[in-house]
Amino acid sequence: MFRTVNGEDYSPAVQQRNILDFGKAHSLLWTDNGSANDRCETGGNCRESGQDRVKRPMNAFIVWSRDQRRKVALENPQMQNSEISKRLGYDWKMLTEAEKQPFFEEAQRLRAMHRDKYPGYKYRPRRKAKEATEIASRRLFSTVQPNAHRGDVVSLPIQGRLRQGHTFTNGKPVKPLTAHEHKQLTPATGASQQLDKPAPQ
């Protein structure tokens, strides 16, 4: 079930005409497939983190790149998605303003439809996992730090990109113990004089 395609089918003029015809023929915002996230745009049930989530309208690059991504993926099945994205970004930059104009117009039309369908919509980006971890670490430190007395060692469960094994004394990082220093720890106190030295900056 393959069809023979000539090079003219992928010319910018034919692609622009096909995209504009498709957009005018469909009253709903475009979606790639019927996945759960896409049902947000078409009025279906969509729950994420206990709240309804409405996707942003597509910009001109996304409108253009949808068909281009499929074409590149079919021509190069071994190519990674990240490589396809780089190639599409480069190809988009190489287009002239006249070639991009229909996609900007289509994106503007989609924004207007989105504004009419969701009048109170406000873009709220999802917090990245790394940010959430760092915020949680800061909150934990701020709750433990006031209870620490001068000279007390406060060990925190450190996550993310912070260095493992670091402890804090009075809010300042302390250099990690070497193997020799670790042997000098006394079982009764669990601390050594080395812990009072601040970490080198």
From Swiss-Prot:
Q: Which InterPro entries match?
A: HMG_box_dom, HMG_box_dom_sf, SRY, SRY-related_HMG-box_TF-like
Keyword Repressor among record annotations: yes
Domain of life, source organism: Eukaryota
Any Pfam family matching the protein: HMG_box
What are the protein's UniProt keywords? Activator, Calmodulin-binding, Cytoplasm, Differentiation, DNA-binding, Nucleus, Repressor, Sexual differentiation, Transcription, Transcription regulation
**Polar residues bias: where?**
186-195
What's the protein name? Sex-determining region Y protein
